Regions:
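C-terminal segment of classical bacterial N-terminal signal peptides
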Residues: 1-6
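Cysteine-centric segments in proteins
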Residues: 8-130
Length: 130
C-alpha cells in the first residue's frame, strides 16, 4: 500500500485579486470577502463558492455580550465566526477572528468541498469539531 498521498503537504493559497482558492496550485473554490457590519473593515464575512459561483459556505463574524450562568452581562464581548453550510443549513462556530486565508484553510483542510460540492461526510465531521 502506498502512503504517498498521506505524506503530501496541503498548500492552501488565496489569490488577492480573484479570490481563487488553490490547493497545491490547483483551483478549488472562490472566496468572496465583505466587511462585517460595524467593524470598519477590520473583520470580514466570507462566502466560499465553487468555481461556477454556487455559494457553498458563509462564515459570519459575530460579536455579542458575554453573560454568566445567571444571564447577567459580564462586561466582556464574545467574538466568534458562525460557519454556515448554505444548502443543508448546518452551522458550526469557531471562536476568535479569521483572515481570508484562515477561512480558506478551514474549508480545504477539512475536505469540505469535493468536485465543487459540499462533501456530506466531511460536513458531519466538521460540525462535530466546530
Amino acid at each position: 500500500a502506498s502512503t504517498a498521498g498521506f505524506a503530501q503537504k496541503m498548500k492552501v493559497q488565496v489569490d488577492k485579486e480573484s479570490g481563487t482558492i488553490t490547493v497545491n496550485e490547483v483551483p478549488q473554490a472562490i472566496l468572496i470577502k465583505e466587511n462585517a457590519p460595524g467593524q470598519l473593515g477590520i473583520n470580514k464575512n466570507f462566502t466560499i463558492t465553487n468555481l461556477d459561483g454556487k455559494e457553498l459556505l458563509y462564515f459570519v463574524f459575530t460579536q455579542e455580550p458575554e453573560t454568566n450562568s445567571r444571564g447577567y452581562k459580564t462586561g466582556k464581548t464574545l467574538t466568534y465566526y458562525t460557519l454556515n453550510f448554505i444548502e443543508s443549513r448546518g452551522q458550526g462556530r469557531r471562536p476568535g477572528t479569521m483572515t481570508a486565508l484562515g477561512a480558506a484553510k478551514i474549508a480545504m483542510k477539512n475536505g469540505l468541498i469535493v468536485d465543487g460540492e459540499i462533501d456530506p461526510d466531511a460536513q458531519k465531521k466538521f460540525l462535530l469539531k466546530y
